[in-house]
Amino acid sequence: MVKQIESKYAFQEALNSAGEKLVVVDFSATWCGPCKMIKPFFHSLSEKYSNVVFLEVDVDDCQDVAAECEVKCMPTFQFFKKGQKVSEFSGANKEKLEATINELI
């Protein structure tokens, strides 16, 4: 399941409550074509990797979160462990997304 993040507080809360689990964050926008293309794949990964926390942040709805995470383009995927960013990349690259998850879990 992918959790939709609505605020900076909710983002921080999700990172904190993940504990030892890997957190994968999809920074996207409704008007972004590549974001729409990879969204179903991102959701399917959340079913496949039940021990990983998947979050979705709409950069227009949560501009403060996007700014704090220094998101410059969409989609950007960031990976967190114990509240710390451990990896990130931009672009709708399905293979890289799954490979990065496998590398970090």
From Swiss-Prot:
One GO BP annotation is: positive regulation of DNA binding
Q: Which UniProt keywords apply?
A: Acetylation, Activator, Cytoplasm, Disulfide bond, Electron transport, Nucleus, Redox-active center, S-nitrosylation, Secreted, Transcription, Transcription regulation, Transport
Q: Where in the cell is it found?
A: Nucleus; Cytoplasm; Secreted
Cellular component terms (Gene Ontology):
cytoplasm; extracellular region; nucleus
Q: State the name under which the record lists this protein.
A: Thioredoxin
Q: Where is this site: Deprotonates C-terminal active site Cys?
A: D26
Subunit info here reads: Homodimer; disulfide-linked. Interacts with TXNIP through the redox-active site. Interacts with MAP3K5 and CASP3. Interacts with APEX1; the interaction stimulates the FOS/JUN AP-1 DNA-binding activity in a redox-dependent manner.
Q: Which residues, if any, are the signal sequence? A: none
User: According to its UniProt record, which protein family does this protein belong to?
Assistant: Belongs to the thioredoxin family.
Active site per UniProt? C32, C35
